[in-house]
């Protein structure tokens, strides 16, 4: 005699996307009815993001070490084409931002700069920071979420254990599966976590503060939408030679939605890993490409840096020719790849880009302050684009390699 599944069982095995949509709707309703009540449930969002950030470093370290240690001879990880796609995507994002900024010139109402901010003094400093993150203490890298360092030590341990005994490799593989199971549990908390994040955000801002920056937000979000729905699909089509939209939409739905609300590429790594597993991608590939993408695949950051820099130039009446704009695209692309190595991310790399037009640091920091005001939307959209693209390009490279092998 069959029995109806319990409510708990239905929740555990139900559609995660549908549950997230319900959570968003309930959060908006709660914040509209009672801002104080919405503020009190905001801790659920902090708890969820904290759980993701806590599990992500150990997940990356164990998965990378396990996949390399257990890698079969003559197997290919397709990392070179994935890294190429990351770089092409980031530059295309900066170029898209330039074209949209030229089409819709934006003037900023500058405000007081952010106190205590310490932007990098040049591109050399950004690259220097990234280089030294490679040789960070492994324990410190795990504690601070330094994914460049975690990748380096994970790869090193994996190579060292590749020649170890089968028993050692089996233990590492079992630990990897155990951590992955913990990640699945944390991801099931997404509807509750996003409910708290949305409720807290709407209660705190009401989005009234964003009204004065409507055009700037339209250019920023518009550029990111064009990248997500036009440029990225075109890049993927050239790679896999078939309709890219089923894959694009699956990545946006499975990765972008969660990333939009967590506003953290690092926190979204476990979500992306689970999506890659669902897509049946090569574990040896995605265990490296996803954390690497969370560090260097920064199309959204390139858009933010480019749009706000050109908005500052337009506000000050600085004439920008096409060659200079092209140079800005290159600089924004390189700077964006180092965004994860700078406290404050893409916003604090804006002074670096502004220096290209001779804009003073004082003015540049006022532009950064504008970025913090619109950060609720800007950072969410930027993270959603960055994170979903990690899975998209990984899947495209894996599919192209598989098609080539079968031909």
UniProtKB/Swiss-Prot annotation:
Q: Catalysed reaction per UniProt?
A: L-serine(in) + Na(+)(in) = L-serine(out) + Na(+)(out); L-threonine(in) + Na(+)(in) = L-threonine(out) + Na(+)(out)
NCBIfam families (alphabetical): PRK13628.1
GO BP terms, alphabetized:
serine transport; threonine transport
* Segments crossing the lipid bilayer: 11-31, 43-63, 82-102, 141-161, 192-212, 216-236, 298-318, 339-359, 363-383
Under Gene Ontology molecular function, one entry of this record is:
neutral L-amino acid:sodium symporter activity
Location of the protein in the cell: Cell inner membrane
**Does this entry carry the keyword Cell inner membrane?**
yes
Q: Name one Pfam family in it.
A: SDF
UniProt organism field: Shewanella denitrificans (strain OS217 / ATCC BAA-1090 / DSM 15013)
The gene that this protein is the product of is: sstT
Q: What does this protein do?
A: Involved in the import of serine and threonine into the cell, with the concomitant import of sodium (symport system).
Q: Which Gene3D superfamilies match?
A: Sodium:dicarboxylate symporter (1.10.3860.10)
Q: Which of UniProt's keywords are assigned here?
A: Amino-acid transport, Cell inner membrane, Cell membrane, Membrane, Symport, Transmembrane, Transmembrane helix, Transport
Membrane topology (UniProt): Multi-pass membrane protein
Q: Which GO terms describe its cellular component?
A: plasma membrane
Family membership: Belongs to the dicarboxylate/amino acid:cation symporter (DAACS) (TC 2.A.23) family.
* Entry-linked InterPro entries: Na-dicarboxylate_symporter, Na:dicarbo_symporter_sf, Ser_Thr_transp_SstT
State the protein's name.
Answer: Serine/threonine transporter SstT
